[in-house]
């Protein structure tokens, strides 16, 4: 089955690193995470869940672990269709991407508050 996209949606860059990018789509009210070879669509709630699950991974403990366990983590988020199987380096890169994204969102919120406060 071939589907044709009839409407064009514009994605706004929120934050980019060499490992990936996060975009915001106002028309669809969602976020696109371009990371680890795939582009995944998240609503804001699921993006927060992704951030929480990545932040809870103890990278230092995993690096200091001397057992023969594989150095990968499976990140699965309830109520989302996406799953990531990532190495420790990829987890660090995803954490950096998510941290930068939420810093940019907070900065945008602060600027919006200040500019709207000046205008009124």
What are these regions (language model features)?
Residues 1-120:
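Positively charged, low-complexity terminal tracts
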């Amino acid at each position: 089955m071939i589907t044709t996209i009839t409407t064009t949606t514009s994605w706004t860059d929120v934050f980019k690193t060499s490992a990936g990018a996060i975009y915001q789509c106002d028309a669809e009210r969602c976020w696109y995470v371009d990371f680890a070879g795939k582009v995944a669509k998240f609503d804001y709630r699921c993006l927060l869940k992704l951030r929480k699950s990545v932040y809870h991974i103890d990278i230092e403990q995993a690096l200091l672990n001397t057992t023969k366990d594989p150095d990968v983590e499976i990140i699965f988020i309830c109520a989302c269709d996406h799953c990531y199987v990532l190495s420790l380096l990829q987890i660090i890169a995803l954490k950096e991407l998510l941290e930068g994204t939420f810093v940019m969102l907070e900065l945008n919120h602060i600027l919006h508050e200040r500019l709207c406060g000046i205008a009124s």
